[in-house]
């Protein structure tokens, strides 16, 4: 397991999309986290504050949003954690113990 934080210590914003659609008498909500290619794996599209504002603004032009999808990934600080973080009985600072 890894603990990921922004390289510059700011807040992480993840891009997502959602839709509400009716089925009979119930409205279903659906969400999806948007990803971008990152080496050989995929990771969420992480936005800075300006990217977050553009992503949430319904007036943002499509080409600007496409630019966010193609942007360089925001650097993250990666720390390997001990496996105790996988124990559902534990829910405290000890879960952030380095490996």
Where are the language model's segments positioned?
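A structured binding-face within diverse protein domains that lines the active/interaction site
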Residues: 1-99
């Amino acid at each position: 397991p890894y603990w990921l934080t922004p390289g510059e210590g700011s807040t992480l914003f993840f891009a997502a999309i959602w839709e509400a659609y009716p089925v009979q008498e119930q409205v279903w909500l659906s969400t999806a986290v948007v990803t971008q290619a990152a080496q050989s794996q995929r990771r969420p599209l992480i936005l800075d504050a300006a990217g977050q504002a553009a992503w949430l603004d319904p007036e943002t032009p499509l080409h600007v949003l496409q630019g966010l999808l193609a942007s360089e990934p925001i650097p993250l600080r990666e720390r390997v954690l001990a496996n105790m973080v996988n124990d559902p009985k534990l829910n405290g600072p000890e879960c952030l113990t380095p490996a």
